[in-house]
A protein has these predicted regions:
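Short amphipathic recognition helices of helix-turn-helix/homeodomain-type DNA-binding modules
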Residues: 2-29, 38-141, 151, 450-452
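Short, well-ordered alpha-helices that flank and scaffold nucleotide-derived cofactor binding pockets
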Residues: 28, 32, 286
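Short, flexible, glycine-rich and Lys/Arg-enriched loop motifs at helix boundaries
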Residues: 33-42, 332-340
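Basic/polar, acidic-poor N-terminal "presequence/leader" segments
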Residues: 134-166
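Conserved binding/catalytic microenvironments
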Residues: 153-468
């Protein structure tokens, strides 16, 4: 904690009293919220609260959590200013939906600046689940007409500029698939910072080439969010994806808007916000229907199925998976945008496997995981690692311990060279599931091996902390 004042915080004391909270009760609620919102867990107790009341200002994240807890207790919004923390910067930069493109560019600049120039000095950004809900409402109710003003000093943009961004996105995506998001993450941010942000304020999406430029910038920004998500920088990812959505909307690309909402659904589900994940996936296919290709629609329904499986809604899961399968089987893929080319039968089978694992159906999880692996291209190393871990879990659910450990060990060997927080988290989940077999010699051998090659349980990656 940083002691910024010795004056008692009477504003905080007044709001705590109004909320009827005790020091112990407030500390407990702050701890619980910090462990469930996708950010770094905060350790505090009644002594910590006493220090806050005496005038010690905690870290920015803790101040935000205090305000959110008091908001919940009172049933009305409590700002940082109302509890005596007026000096803190707004951590929600990048989460607000900008009316003007210039505002989005400023937000994107702040995000890339944070990532590139102060990665170790800045406190981790937190995930704000309410921001997803606000975006869903905006997407489903907003006018199709973009209200952005034309640039004050327009610069000519050529097809070459558009192709340069498209090719950069393809290259960084290849790195992401093969080596994990940690490899291209800062490269994507640097490209945005150096090649895109200086130009985009002078480009109008009202012109055909300008619209294409915005579409490609949105796709690149989406990738920045996806690589951040894969490395566990959840707050950073949420902000990149929000701005990617705004840029895609400026380009008038409803299919890409849906794709970004589907990515948000994926992240929300990963962080345990299952209903919000369902809402995001449904918003994707409702808003993009008639504008997205069948392959893209299949992805949206697959994301809905995955979130429904987390809530154990078996009937709804089956319906969503069958709908995804029907969409994928419709017509050719010639009209698919480049960013959906990866989503093939192997990817859909992987989604089936994930869902059946979460529903506890070991037989079907095993079947679809094996089919996905058979159909997969070897270039998608990370996707294969996910699916093989699901297969290992399915073997474990079926009681085949030897097969489960054999597959999991091969994934752990691959994970050593992958810079992917999510792959590590899959293996952590598998290790947790082994607790019932902890006395088995083969299990002890595997756990010893895993400890030697994977991040320790105290590492930021293993504990699902935000590293932004």
């Amino acid at each position: 904690m940083v002691d910024t004042t010795k004056q008692p915080n009477t504003l905080l004391a007044g709001v705590i009293k109004k909320a009827g909270a005790t020091n112990k009760g407030l500390a407990r609620r702050v701890r619980l919220l910090s462990e469930s919102d996708g950010g770094e867990p905060v350790r505090c107790d009644h002594v910590s609260v006493k220090r806050w009341l005496d005038g010690t200002t905690p870290q920015s994240r803790t101040c935000q959590l205090i305000a959110r807890v008091l908001t919940e207790l009172l049933g009305e919004h409590v700002s940082l200013e109302e509890i005596g923390y007026t000096e803190l910067q707004n951590p929600d930069t990048g989460l607000e939906y900008p009316e003007e493109i210039a505002q989005s560019v400023m937000a994107l600049g702040a995000i890339t600046d944070r990532e590139l120039r102060m990665p170790n000095r800045a406190e981790p950004l937190t995930v704000v689940p309410e921001a997803w809900s606000g975006l869903v409402v905006r997407w489903l109710t907003d006018s199709d007409h973009d209200r952005s003003n034309p640039p004050a000093e327009p610069h000519p943009i050529t097809v070459v500029d558009v192709e340069a961004i498209r090719e950069a996105t393809a290259m960084f995506s290849s790195f992401d698939y093969k080596y994990g998001g940690g490899r291209p993450k800062t490269l994507v941010a640097a490209f945005l910072d150096q090649e895109v942000l200086p130009n985009i304020p002078h480009v109008s999406p009202q012109h055909p080439v300008g619209r294409e430029y915005f579409r490609e910038v949105a796709a690149l920004t989406r990738l920045a969010g996806w690589t951040a998500y894969d490395t566990g920088a959840h707050g950073l990812a949420q902000r990149y994806l929000t701005q990617a959505f705004r840029l895609a909307k400026a380009a008038g690309d409803k299919a890409l808007c849906g794709r970004i909402l589907a990515n948000m659904s994926h992240q929300a589900n990963f962080l345990g916000h299952y209903q919000r994940a369902i809402d995001l996936a449904r918003a994707a296919y409702k808003g993009a229907n008639g504008h997205a290709t069948p392959t893209t629609m299949a992805l949206f329904y697959a994301m809905e199925a995955r979130a429904l499986a987390s809530l154990r809604k078996e009937g709804d899961v089956t319906a969503a998976l069958l709908t995804a399968e029907r969409w994928l089987s419709q017509g050719s893929r010639e009209n698919d945008p480049e960013w959906i080319h990866y989503f093939d039968l192997a990817e859909l089978y992987a989604e089936f496997a994930h869902c059946y694992r979460d529903l506890g159906n070991a037989e079907l999880a095993n079947h679809y995981a094996a089919e996905s692996i058979r159909e997969s291209e070897s270039t998608y190393v990370r996707s294969l690692s996910f699916c093989r871990t699901v297969l290992a879990t399915a073997h474990l659910q079926a009681g085949d311990l030897d097969a489960a450990l054999h597959v999991a060990k091969s994934v752990a060997e691959t994970a050593m060279s992958l810079k992917s927080f999510r792959v590590i988290s899959y293996l952590d989940d598998f290790r947790d599931r082994l607790s019932a077999h902890s006395e088995e010699p083969l299990v002890r051998e595997f756990l010893d091996f895993a400890r030697g090659v994977l991040p320790s349980e105290d590492s930021p990656v293993s504990r699902r902390l935000v590293v932004a």
